[in-house]
A protein has these predicted regions:
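A preference for well-ordered globular domain cores
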Residues: 1-105
Length: 105
């Protein structure tokens, strides 16, 4: 577990007794949750289903599908960086950069 201890004198100590594999798994899970949350905030499940069924006009369906694909690709980019990390700090430093939301969603 990674712990941060802040002292009254302003000194900060970081304790990290996780293995690299544990740190990688923890970060991948966090980014997976962030990706899902980002998609669901932008395109709720009902919107995703309607787009998959083609209920909306084709341009909107395509924009929704492309946004979800962009989020998935960003997650996969991050996952690759995390799995290539050689230290816990390197794995923890990988951040998800949400793709821009297309107009018309």
């Amino acid at each position: 577990m990674k712990s941060i201890l802040a002292h009254i004198d302003g000194k900060i100590e970081v304790f990290d007794d996780r293995t690299l594999i544990e740190a990688q798994a923890e970060r991948i899970e966090l980014l997976r949750e962030m990706t899902t949350q980002n998609i669901n905030q932008t395109c709720p499940q009902s919107t995703q289903q309607n787009a998959a069924l083609g209920i909306y006009e084709p341009a909107r369906c395509e924009a929704i599908k492309n946004y979800i694909a962009a989020c998935r690709n960003e997650y996969l980019r991050c996952k690759g960086l995390i799995l290539a990390a050689t230290s816990n700090d390197e794995a923890d430093s990988v951040t998800f950069i949400a793709p821009p939301v297309p107009e018309g969603l």
